[in-house]
């Protein structure tokens, strides 16, 4: 899945979170998920820190647009949530 697809999924996830939880809780709960959506992107630390500290919803959507523009076609290696033992 490339970054463009991940951004689209993150936008839909954010919209649902806002709808179900309200603006304040919805934004706060999405912060933990954003890191997972964009894990493995090169030089992403500064953008990630910004993404997980923003409260303003239009700014969050704007930053998602920037992520899509900058890394859009990049496809990081799939990361399993299950560790093999």
Per-segment meaning from a language model:
Residues 1-85:
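Alpha/beta catalytic cores of nucleotide-metabolism and tRNA/nucleoside-modifying enzymes
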């Amino acid at each position: 899945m490339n970054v463009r697809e991940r951004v689209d999924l993150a936008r839909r996830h954010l919209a649902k979170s806002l709808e179900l939880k309200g603006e304040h809780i919805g934004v706060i709960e999405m912060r933990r998920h954003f890191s997972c959506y964009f894990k493995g992107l090169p030089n992403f630390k500064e953008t990630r820190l910004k993404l997980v500290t923003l409260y303003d919803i239009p700014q969050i959507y704007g930053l998602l647009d920037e992520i899509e523009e900058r890394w859009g076609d990049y496809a990081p290696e799939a990361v399993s949530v299950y560790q093999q033992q």
